[in-house]
Amino acid sequence: MSTEKLTVALLSGGASAEREVSLKSGEQVFNALDKQRYLVLRYDPAHDLTRLAADAEKIDVALIILHGRMGEDGTIQGLLESLGIPYQGSGVLGSAVAMNKILSKQLYIHAGLPVAPHLVADRREPPDLDTVADRLGLPVVVKPEHEGSSIGLSIVRNRDQLAAAVETGWQYDRRCLIEKYVHGIEITGGVLGNDHLQALPLIEIIPGEAYEFFDYKAKYTPGASREICPARLSDTITAKAQEYARKAHQALCCKGYSRTDMIVSGNDIFILETNTIPGMTATSLFPQAAAVAGISFSALLDRLIELALED
């Protein structure tokens, strides 16, 4: 290991549907890393894995700034472990579990966390969609089992839209989640730490008028949505949501940091999903919450590296 600067492998790009987001995040992370403290080597897993393996012995720690398949799903985490390279965030298990929306729901329920009513549509055994609509009511949200950034997601308000939405989900995965649409305030709660989890200020998300929900474009287009931090919630709801973010992190075996999306409906909070590698672009939520907590972007990266090296 280096006796002066830490050698950091910065991984961004990859081959998932979220490649462009990853590249933007990676560029901002590279610019924010303190070059007085770190020697930063950049790798795109889409074509640099052989070089990464060859460089493994000189790498002190990796920053995984990848999203979606082969980034957040435990694949790259397993490779880094086989190479003996520490990395920030969740391990193989936590990454794989959080990436799977259906399994995540089961673990949330097991942990006593509230989720919206939902059903699973399996392409091998297609459900009767009229029965689905009767059981859940409309509107519903249809999501592929594994994709992130709302890729493949549809909101269905009429029965005649349901079949097409499920077919869209099946383009990405054999199974998709059909979830009751909950009207309310969309919030997200980040946590930071290993043994001691620091709950960051909650962010309230208000998609712009052109966006029905916080979808891919709303997330990554500057000015497409408003984010209010801290969220405009009562102290009681705030404390409950922050505790839910901690519990969701633990229920999915996450590590280091995560961000859990939730809906506040009246006095109720419903867990949507947990992100194990939150975005790191100018419009990203986790860095915004950290900044409100007094943690600059550069200091956040320092902290993630420290947490990666704790084990």
Curated annotation (Swiss-Prot):
Reaction equation(s) it catalyzes: 2 D-alanine + ATP = D-alanyl-D-alanine + ADP + phosphate + H(+)
Q: Which GO terms describe its biological process?
A: cell wall organization; peptidoglycan biosynthetic process; regulation of cell shape
User: Where in the cell does this protein reside?
Assistant: Cytoplasm
Q: Looking at the UniProt record for this protein, which Gene Ontology cellular component terms does it annotate, in alphabetical order?
A: cytoplasm
The UniProt annotation places Mg(2+) 1 binding at 261, 273
Q: Which PROSITE patterns does this entry report, sorted A to Z?
A: ATP_GRASP, DALA_DALA_LIGASE_1, DALA_DALA_LIGASE_2
Residue numbers binding Mg(2+) 2: 273, 275
E.C. numbers: 6.3.2.4
* Span of domain ATP-grasp: 105-306
- Give me the comment on cofactor binding: Binds 2 magnesium or manganese ions per subunit.
Keyword entries, A-Z: ATP-binding, Cell shape, Cell wall biogenesis/degradation, Cytoplasm, Ligase, Magnesium, Manganese, Metal-binding, Nucleotide-binding, Peptidoglycan synthesis
Q: What are the required cofactors?
A: Mg(2+); Mn(2+)
Decide whether keyword Membrane is in the record.
Answer: no
Q: Which GO terms describe its molecular function?
A: ATP binding; D-alanine-D-alanine ligase activity; metal ion binding
Q: In which pathway does it act?
A: Cell wall biogenesis; peptidoglycan biosynthesis
Leading EC class? ligase
Which Gene3D superfamilies does the annotation name? 3.40.50.20, ATP-grasp fold, A domain (3.30.1490.20), ATP-grasp fold, B domain (3.30.470.20)
Q: Which InterPro entries match?
A: ATP-grasp, ATP_grasp_subdomain_1, D-Ala_lig_Van_CS, D_ala_D_ala, Dala_Dala_lig_C, Dala_Dala_lig_N, PreATP-grasp_dom_sf
Which residues does the record give as ATP binding sites?
A: 133-188
Task: Please give the function described in this protein's UniProt entry.
Answer: Cell wall formation.
Which family does the record assign?
A: Belongs to the D-alanine--D-alanine ligase family.
| NCBIfam families documented for this protein | D_ala_D_alaTIGR, PRK01372.1, PRK01966.1-4
Q: What is this protein called?
A: D-alanine--D-alanine ligase
